[in-house]
């Protein structure tokens, strides 16, 4: 299951495809409004979910237990972009001040955006942030079918432990995820290195109605950004950077220990 559906999660989509080609039962669905990943994992409704290490933090601060454990990295760069009505090759983040911005309200996308804004010397309070309607700039994940991309959030801030795969601790200990993890490692490396048009063609079934050209250009952007660089283990330093982001924008009350949220992928 995915908490969001996007080409940003191409390693997971390719893993699902490869598992199916190998004869495994590999259902794929997207989290519905009102559903919570930790509840679905806890109740055994799903085995493995695309989420983020940050999704554990607020729940932990509310005393929620048990929570999923994150065992494999998907992305180490934010995958959102800022789009404007017209091309602006001379765009600077300072241009956001005094303008309207339609921002994604998800906890992690918004935290990353606020951090990128601050990291680039912009006063968040001077931006008119909208939840709906039309704006001078739009903050969204790829593929982006309208507007002109003027900035990448991920390119405008340090690498960070972003999207990851999680499951229950008991399930991770069973050894059942081994085949999935082996296939996932192969899928992630292929998505990272294969020509973007080839990746787009292979995952076209997941994006009905999206042109191959748009999908390929989105994948190319993520490849160039280095979203899928590194191994599948969740690096401690990138986890700490994610904590830095959320702490900087007031998204967490305390720093959560790596071992309480992350585990190594099964060998």
Please place each PLM-identified region on the residue numbering:
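Generic structural signal for individual residues within well-ordered alpha-helical segments
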Residues: 38, 97, 128, 178-181, ...
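Pocket-lining segment of extracytoplasmic ligand-binding domains
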Residues: 129, 136-205
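Periplasmic-binding protein-like
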Residues: 74-84, 151-173, 181, 220-224, ...
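Short, glycine-/small- and polar/acidic-enriched structural segments
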Residues: 1-141, 146-159
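N-terminal hydrophobic or amphipathic helices and topogenic motifs
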Residues: 1-27, 34-35, 42, 229-267
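Short, mixed-charge aromatic SLiMs
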Residues: 35-37, 137, 209-210, 265-267
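Short flexible/disordered coil segments
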Residues: 59-61, 89-96, 210-221, 251-267
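Secondary-structure end/capping motifs
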Residues: 173-253
């Amino acid at each position: 299951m995915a908490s969001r559906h996007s080409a940003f999660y191409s390693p997971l989509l390719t893993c699902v495809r490869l598992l199916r080609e190998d004869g495994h039962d590999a259902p794929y669905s997207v989290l519905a409004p009102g559903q919570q990943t930790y509840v679905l994992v806890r109740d055994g409704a799903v085995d493995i979910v695309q989420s983020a290490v940050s999704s554990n933090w607020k729940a932990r601060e509310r005393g929620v237990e048990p929570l999923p454990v994150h065992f494999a990295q998907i992305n180490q760069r934010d995958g959102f972009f800022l789009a404007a009505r017209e091309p602006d090759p001379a765009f600077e983040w300072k241009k956001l001040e005094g303008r309207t911005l339609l921002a994604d309200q998800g906890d992690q996308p918004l935290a990353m955006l606020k951090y990128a804004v601050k990291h680039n010397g912009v006063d968040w309070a001077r931006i008119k942030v909208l939840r709906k309607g039309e704006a001078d700039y739009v903050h969204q994940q790829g593929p982006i079918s309208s507007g002109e991309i003027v900035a990448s959030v991920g390119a405008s801030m340090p690498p960070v432990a972003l999207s990851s795969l999680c499951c229950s601790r008991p399930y991770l200990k069973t050894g059942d995820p081994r085949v999935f993890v082996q296939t996932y490692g192969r899928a992630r490396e292929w998505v990272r290195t294969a020509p973007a048009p080839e990746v787009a063609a292979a995952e076209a079934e997941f994006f009905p109605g999206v042109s191959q050209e748009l999908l390929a250009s989105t994948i190319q952007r993520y490849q160039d950004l280095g979203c899928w660089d590194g191994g599948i283990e969740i690096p401690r330093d990138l986890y700490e950077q994610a904590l830095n982001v959320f702490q900087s924008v007031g998204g967490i009350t305390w720093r959560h220990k790596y071992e309480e949220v992350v585990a190594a992928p099964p060998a």
